[in-house]
From Swiss-Prot:
SUPFAM superfamilies: Ribosomal protein L13 (SSF52161). PANTHER family: LARGE RIBOSOMAL SUBUNIT PROTEIN UL13M, RIBOSOMAL PROTEIN L13. This protein is one of the early assembly proteins of the 50S ribosomal subunit, although it is not seen to bind rRNA by itself. It is important during the early stages of 50S assembly. It comes from the Bacteria. Keywords: Ribonucleoprotein, Ribosomal protein. CDD domains: Ribosomal_L13 (cd00392). PROSITE patterns: RIBOSOMAL_L13. This is Large ribosomal subunit protein uL13. The keyword Ribosomal protein applies. InterPro entries: Ribosomal_uL13 (IPR005822), Ribosomal_uL13_bac-type (IPR005823), Ribosomal_uL13_CS (IPR023563), Ribosomal_uL13_sf (IPR036899). The keyword Ribosomal protein applies.
Length: 150
């Protein structure tokens, strides 16, 4: 009888991936990125461990949504004070803080536990095409096909 192998934290090889969000659909990009962050693309995936990779998302301000969502989709936040609810449309939030849209979409697809919070720290989202992680030599993650190129 074979035993299930559980990877030790030292044996997990973490890579850096770069995703260009320009002209990508928000939900489709978020599912692929969440899968890579979680480690589901690796053969040693373990549900209760952080086996995922780092992901850098650039051009967050150029992400697209389908239909009328740019005018109708609402983002809510609350200050914690009575009457402190703030509501903002996708278009308004995209012009103000485009990184928050991508982060919120991906965070909602991660586990809502301590593990999910740990996985979320490996996501880096930037407005524009510049990022400070070039020293990590990220591989380009193509979302339309399942290929990874350098």
């Amino acid at each position: 009888m074979n035993k299930t192998s559980v990877p030790s934290p030292d044996s997990i090889d973490r890579q850096w991936f770069l995703v260009d969000a320009e002209n990508q659909t928000l939900g489709r990009l978020a599912t692929e990125v969440a899968s890579v962050l979680r480690g589901k693309t690796k053969p040693n995936f373990t549900p209760h461990l952080d086996t995922g990779d780092f992901v850098i998302v650039v051009n967050a301000e150029k992400i697209k949504v389908t239909g009328k969502k740019s005018d109708q989709k609402l983002y809510r936040r609350h200050s914690g004070r009575p009457g402190g609810m703030k509501v903002e449309t996708f278009k308004a939030l995209q012009s103000r803080i485009p990184e928050r849209i991508v982060e919120k979409a991906i965070k909602g697809m991660l586990p809502h536990t301590r593990l999910g919070r740990q996985l979320f720290t490996k996501l880096k989202v930037y407005k524009g095409s510049d990022h400070p992680h070039s020293a990590q030599e990220p591989k380009i993650l193509s979302l339309n096909s399942e290929s990874v190129t350098k």
